Every structure is written in C-alpha cells, then in structure tokens.
Amino acid sequence: MMSFNIRSSAGLLLVLCAAVTNVFSQKLLTNYTATLPATDALGRKLPAFNVVGKEKSDKFVGLFYWTWHYAQAKLKPNNTTAFLQKHPDALYDYKHPAWPQNIMNFWNEPLFGYYVDTDKWVLWKHAEMLADAGVDMIMFDCTNGDMVWKPAYMALCEVFSEARKNGIRTPQIAFMMGFGASKDTKSAISQVYNDLYKPGLYKELWFQWKGKPLIMAYPDNIDPEIKNFFTFRPGQPVYNKGPERKDHWGWLEIYPQHGFVKNDDGSFEQMTVGTSQNWTKENGLNPMNAKGAFGRSYTNKNGQNTNKDAHQYGLNFQEQWDHALKQNVELVFVTGWNEWIAGRYETWQDQPNAFPDQFDTEHSRDIEPMKGGHQDNYYYQLIANIRRFKGMPAPEKASAAKTISMDGKFDEWVNVKPEFIAHKGNTIHRDADGFAGTHYTNTTGRNDMVKAKVARDNKYVYFYVETADQLTSHKDPAWMRLFIDIDRDKKTGWEGYDFVVNRKSPDQKAFLEKSTKGWNWKQVAQVDFNYTGNQLEIRIPRTFLALKNTLNFEFKWSDNMQTDGDIIDFLVNGDVAPSGRFNYPYKEH
C-alpha cells in the first residue's frame, strides 16, 4: 500500500479531487458486454474468448464522431435514398425541380430519428452502445473552419460523465482539427483549450496519448502553452499516400491502408479503417455519388458487388479490418459513427450535383444503426472486429448447483455466480425536437434492470433479476419478460429465443411459452415466480425446457417492449438486460 505525506489541507484537497476523478476513469470501469454473445441479422456471431484470446491492454480503438448537427436543425430533413427512388432522373441534375429547398439531405434515416446531437436521450444511447462495443475514444469533427460546436460537445460530456457515475465505460474524447496550420485551425484549438482543457472540465473523459491529451491537429503555429499541453498528431487528408510527415495520423484511406507514426520496434501507432470512401479508381477523390465510388460493397479484391442486398454485409469495412488485423498497430481509427448529413453542391471535383461525403445507403460511411436497410449490422460487425483486435476477458464460470427456496427473501442468491451486470440509468425519458418538423418522445423507460443471475439443481432452473428501484406491478403490459435461447441457435424460435416467460402478464403464476415459429407462441406451462421490492425470481422445471443433462443456453430480460416481434425494439424502447442483441450465456462446466 502506498503512503502519502500530506503537508497541507490544500494538498489533501488535491488528492481527494484526483481520487474522485479517478473513480470514474475509463480504466477502472468494466465493459459489461465484453464477454457476451450476440448474433446479428445475417447470422454472424460475435467471436468468443477461445477465438480472440486474452484482452490486450496496449490496443485501442478510436471512432470518428460528429457533433455539428444541431447547427443545421432549423432545416427539414430529406432522405436522399428515398427521394432518388422516386426521382431517379434528378441524380445528376442540381436544378431538377423535384429537389426540395431549405432542407438538409440525409443519406437515410437514423434509427433514433433525425435527432439533434444535444438530445440527451440519444447521447445516453450512444454512451451505452459505444461502451458495449469497446470503443476507447471518439474524435469530434472540427475540420471545417474554426467551428468547434461547443454546445454539442459539452452536452455529450455532461451525459458521458453522468453515465460514468452509473458505471458505464464510455469512450474518452478528442478533437480532429483542420488539415493544415491555418488561422482557423489555430483558433479552433484555442477555443477547445480555453473552454474545456484549461479549466479542467470533464478531465476524466480526455483521451491521453503518450502522456498528454490527444489532439489531431497541426502544431506548427500554436502558442507554446497549448503546444506543450497536447500530444499533437496532424491529420493526413489524402486517402492513398500514407504519412508525409513523421507525426502524421490518418482519418480515412483506401485499401491497403498505411501505418502512421512508426515506432522503434517497427510497429505503428495508428491505422485507419473505413466503411466506404469517396474515391474512384479513375479520378481519385470524388463525390460519393460519382460513378465507381467506393461504397459499402466495394472491395479492392472484387470491385463493386452489385447484388441488391450487398450493403448489408460491410464488405469494404471487413476488407479494411482484415488488413488492419494483420498489422502491428496500437490504435485503429474507424470512420465513422454518425455523420448522416449529405451535403449537396452544384459541382465538386468536376462532378455535377455532387454529394461529397455521404450520399445514399450504399454510398455512406456511418456505423450507427439506421431504420430499415442494414439496421444494426455494422454495429455488431464493429464489435466483432474490436474483439479480434483487442481480445476479451475470459468468461466467468458458473458456481455450483444450488436449490433456491422461492420464498421471496432472495438471500440465497448472494453467492450465485456469474453475476451479470446491466447498464444503470437508461430508463430516462425523451422529449426533444429533432430537425425541423420532427419532435421525439419516448416514455417507455420503466424498470431499470441492473443485475441478473441463474441457478440450477437437478429439477429446476432459476432466474433472478434486480432493478435499480422498486419493480412496477406485474399487471403492467410487457412486464419483465424473460427470453431463453435454449439451443443457442438463431435459426430456431424467434430471433433464436425458443421460450418466453411473461409475454402474457402473469397472475398467481407466470406463463411459460414456446415459439412455434417466429413471434408465434404456445403455452407450455405455468411456472412459479416471486417479486418483492426490486428483486424478481422465476423457477422453471427442466422438463418444460427440454434441456439436456448439461446446461448451455442464452437468456435476456426485457421490460416494456413496444413492438412485439421486432428485435430492433431492444435498442429503442423500455429496458433490456443485456442491451440490443446481446444475451447472457449460462453453461455448466
């Protein structure tokens, strides 16, 4: 144990303040889903511990993140993909009369709607989702002029800081500035330094690199005070040249990507991975709607895959990840999460009616889930590759068999392992304006589930769940449902779940139902349940579950589901434990 010689009350205060900050530091928080299984809509399973191996403490993942939507929110949103399906002749005609005026084009609609990035409900969702993914750092786009979008990054810091207090391992933050040592870049750096860093605001969220807060910017014309405060890594704007100065980092490249900042041992600090690139073989840098642009389904190996649903698979994304995983790099920087906005110009790079950065579902580069289309496929693809890059903790083994009395006292659950932890604080309600003409409300957050366990003996399997506050009445609709994937096979049941408890509100006993196919259920039996305060337990006879001698299944809790039969509801409404498509695994050893 370390000892400290505190010489003054001021010194004691500094130590206490440092300790408080440290409590919520990313390194001391746990990624609750790091060991959990999930299967995406395409049937792709997340890699397990026996595939990716132990967690590597020297590997990091950064993600490009956009904070400037609020500045455009007075405009109505226009879905470019949907618009061009109705007006294909407007594709290269800037003055086509069908193009609406006073709008902001989106390549498609985000899952959470046309939100403004000061919407705290959305920011909390991002905090959880990126924590679950294992993202270490998000980097804000401040590459246009000297605008740094302070209201949005401060709103995010406030929400992420609150999420940390609830145990959520949110990413750290950093800024990407303009690609050059310009007056605008100098001004932007000064703004974030004076407004955020110098006063020490949200210090626990700063991403540190080589002992200092990281900033992706050019240091050439920066005042000494600021220059000495940050680790500077100037951004290389070009996609195909690699580093042109020793301290260059990339933000997006075409395949095969270069390593940036070579270390003494031959490894590299950084490499980029992108979902798509506004680039063509013929002309290099081009708008996303240029013929031959490298969309989501383009690969260097096979060119453009023109199958209708090719965008679902992230072929471009995976080719870049496969390359990065073969290299020895410290940090993979992924572009990107949530740009969404598709700027339209009369000409750009000699292209008429140009969409430089985002265009449509195929020619876009966001990973954040969308409504319809590829939904959350890219999100789970990101998680899968982060696991391959960083490894993962070994899953905790189940404790010995134990009989639970079902007496409503719950003391017998104390030493049952594993103890599955779920995000706390995520039942907040939403009431916020989006882009012009949109307003979003969501009041479905109800029972905030924070912990789950399973026990078993020769006759029964027991399930336990705990909430942050007192449970609501079991007569509430869609109350505390338990989904069980008994064979760990997504092809059976509904989204892999073969059984459900509490799809119908329980009475004296709970109803156990089996899927006949999809969201069609047939009652199997009535089973015992108890709940008191913030704890609930359910007992199911093994015979009803058609279990083999050795247990090996997955399960999930859901409260206040709104759209029966739609698994995407798990990302939007009520609360689930664990989040999204993740499940808790339970296996006898």
Question: What annotation goes with each model-predicted range?
Answer:
Residues 54-73, 213-316, 320-333:
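Aromatic-lined glycan-binding groove of carbohydrate-active enzymes
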Residues 56-62, 133-138, 166-173, 202-204, ...:
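Loop/turn elements at helix/coil->beta-strand transitions in domains of secreted/extracellular proteins
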Residues 396-407, 483-507, 542-589:
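Acidic/polar low-complexity flexible segments
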Residues 26-73, 204-206, 222-227, 231, ...:
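N-terminal module-boundary/linker segments of secreted carbohydrate-active enzymes
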